């Protein structure tokens, strides 16, 4: 490898762990392998897990979140711990067409119901 070629080791510095905190949602992650994030660098990213959509809001916790894997105490080691400096609070939303047909109705969400967001 020549001295002018980029090093792959620099990509390691760009890794950031993020805690996702879901509000008003009962989501079974075990059955939701299909996952994507739109606008991760924006103030309100959109997260899709399976067929459900969530609108995120970034929060900076005081200190650092420590995520501990669900394992037996005897198996716990420092290698399994994850440190996170940012938290993404997620609220479930419902996407609606920008120009809905007259037959469809859009209503305001009630407490615990997903917010309607127009598709761009």
Swiss-Prot record:
Keywords, alphabetical: DNA-binding, Nucleus, Transcription, Transcription regulation
Subcellular location, record wording: Nucleus
One GO MF term: RNA polymerase III general transcription initiation factor activity
Pfam families membership: TFIIIC_sub6
Entry's Gene Ontology BP terms: transcription by RNA polymerase III; transcription initiation at RNA polymerase III promoter
Region: Disordered, residue numbers: 96-120
Biased composition (Polar residues): 101-120
Keyword Cell division: no
The organism's place on the tree of life at top rank: Eukaryota
Main location: nucleus
GO cellular component, one term: transcription factor TFIIIC complex
Function recorded in the entry: TFIIIC mediates tRNA and 5S RNA gene activation by binding to intragenic promoter elements. Upstream of the transcription start site, TFIIIC assembles the initiation complex TFIIIB-TFIIIC-tDNA, which is sufficient for RNA polymerase III recruitment and function. Part of the tauA domain of TFIIIC that binds boxA DNA promoter sites of tRNA and similar genes.
Subunit structure: Component of the TFIIIC complex including sfc1, sfc3, sfc4, sfc6 and sfc7. The subunits are organized in two globular domains, tauA and tauB, connected by a proteolysis-sensitive and flexible linker.
Name of this chain's protein: Transcription factor tau subunit sfc7
Organism: Schizosaccharomyces pombe (strain 972 / ATCC 24843)
Gene field: sfc7
